[in-house]
UniProtKB/Swiss-Prot annotation:
One GO MF term attached to the UniProt entry: sigma factor antagonist activity
Disordered: region residues: 29-55, 72-105
Organism: Streptomyces coelicolor (strain ATCC BAA-471 / A3(2) / M145)
A single BP term in Gene Ontology: negative regulation of DNA-templated transcription
InterPro entries: Anti-sigma-factor_SerPK, HATPase_C_sf
Organism ancestry: Bacteria, Bacillati, Actinomycetota, Actinomycetes, Kitasatosporales
Protein name: Uncharacterized protein SCO4941
Domain of life: Bacteria
Biased composition (Basic and acidic residues): 72-81
């Protein structure tokens, strides 16, 4: 999601309000979203960026680790969301045990 946040700063300006939302889905997986005040929705995958291009890679970079993603217009705002691949449902995540405490000698 750093790409989505960087996009807000680069194209809307530093200090532009953006919302980052983490949602736990009924499946236990996580959805991550960034909403910003730009209502324009970019082409979903505009094609590969050139080696020397300084922009145009954001959605392609998002597509690699998150095969489930999208961009939608919400009135005068845009929302980019993704669901990272391979993420275990929360009920499968194990909490590590507390470290052992030794008494001093």
């Amino acid at each position: 999601m750093t790409e989505a946040l960087t996009h807000v700063i680069d194209h809307e300006g530093q200090g532009t309000p953006a919302t980052v939302r983490l949602t736990v889905l009924p499946s236990g997986h996580t959805r991550v979203g960034v909403t910003d005040p730009d209502p324009r929705v970019p082409p979903l995958l505009p094609g590969p960026a050139g080696v020397t291009d300084e922009s145009g890679r954001g959605l392609a970079l998002l597509d690699a680790p998150a095969p489930r993603w999208g961009v939608e217009q919400r009135g005068d705002r845009r929302a980019v969301r993704c669901e990272p691949a391979g993420e275990p449902p929360l009920d499968d995540v194990r909490t590590p045990a507390a470290p052992a405490v030794r008494s001093g000698r």
